[in-house]
A protein has these predicted regions:
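An N-terminally biased module of ancient metal coordination in phosphate/nucleic-acid-related enzymes
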Residues: 1-70, 75-79
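Active-site gating/metal-coordination segments in enzymes
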Residues: 63-64, 71-148
């Protein structure tokens, strides 16, 4: 991936899983965005095993990765998807000293979403929450986030 070894240990705070299982949930029209716009390597975009992900992390000295279970927009709207928490929980089991889970938040879910967040923390050992407010066309301090 790179010829230059990073000597500084890194914690990557927002990591999207690229496993085949996780990619099944993403809309198929994202290829151009990931590969052309943000220059994701084609091999990475096509999917990695957990072990392949750990190998890439080793290559650039990423010691820990906070894996997000994103909630991209409200379900039912075009382009929206939610990655089930269980998929991230399964990844954490592969290397719990390096993978940590962040539960995606959908502010339109209200108290049901709060209960899901609580379950992710208590049952799956997630360490926190993650949100993309722009996918909901809300500011981060919108009142819909208050229950969380």
């Amino acid at each position: 991936m790179t010829d230059k070894k990073n000597l500084i240990p890194v914690i990557d705070a927002v990591v999207n899983l690229q496993t085949a299982e996780a990619l099944e949930f993403r809309p198929s029209d994202r290829r151009e965005f990931y590969i052309e716009k943000i220059k994701v390597d084609t091999d990475v975009f096509e999917g990695l095993t957990h072990e392949g992900m750990l190998a890439l992390m080793d290559e650039v000295n990423i010691q820990k990765a906070f894996l997000i279970a994103p909630k991209i927009g409200q379900l039912g709207l075009q382009g929206s998807y939610h990655l089930p928490y269980e998929i991230v929980a399964d990844a954490i089991k592969v290397d719990p000293n390096r993978f940590y889970g962040l539960a995606g938040i959908d502010p339109t879910e209200g108290m049901e979403g709060v209960r899901s967040l609580e379950r992710a923390i208590k049952e799956f050992g997630f360490i926190g929450a993650h949100s993309y407010p722009h996918w909901f066309e809300l500011s981060p301090d919108d009142r819909k986030y208050y229950p969380f």
